């Protein structure tokens, strides 16, 4: 929140409660619920945003194919939201898991941003399929 300056705003959305932070508007809700997205859009008003960060992950069931599908669905929702809300040069950071649907999602990212960078966090276990994709400079492709 310190990086956005006096005119910037930070919004945080989570299903779990979060302790208040200065200069952060927190919305408790599920990103998959239309009522939550409506509340977020109402808070944004007519403003476009510079950056969307999605660290969403579903509750893991242990059924790999189901867990992967849910992860990719959340990433797709976040990309759809980003394309609607980002300004013309906005950026999007999203956590995904490599597996079924990853290549298609990567293609959608490449259609939507001028450059896509992949990063595996050092904190992520070596055998984990977790990876972050950073879409730089939205260019308006339709995923």
Where does each model-flagged region fall?
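Helix-to-beta-strand junctions that scaffold the AdoMet/dcAdoMet cofactor pocket
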Residues: 4-6, 86-87
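S-adenosyl-L-methionine
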Residues: 6-7, 13-61
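Class I S-adenosylmethionine-dependent transferase superfamily signal
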Residues: 40, 81-82, 109
């Amino acid at each position: 929140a310190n990086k956005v300056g006096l005119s910037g705003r930070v919004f945080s959305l989570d299903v779990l409660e979060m302790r208040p932070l200065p200069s952060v508007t927190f919305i408790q809700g599920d990103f998959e619920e239309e009522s939550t997205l409506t509340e977020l859009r109402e808070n944004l008003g007519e403003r476009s945003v510079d950056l969307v960060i999605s660290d969403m992950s579903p509750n893991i069931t242990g059924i790999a194919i189901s867990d992967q599908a849910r992860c990719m669905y959340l990433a797709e929702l976040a990309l759809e939201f980003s394309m609607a809300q980002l300004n013309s040069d906005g950026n999007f950071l999203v956590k995904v898991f490599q597996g079924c649907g990853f290549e298609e999602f990567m293609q959608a990212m490449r259609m939507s941003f001028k450059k896509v960078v992949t990063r595996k966090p050092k904190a992520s276990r070596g055998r984990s399929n977790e990876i972050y994709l950073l879409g730089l400079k939205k260019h308006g492709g339709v995923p």
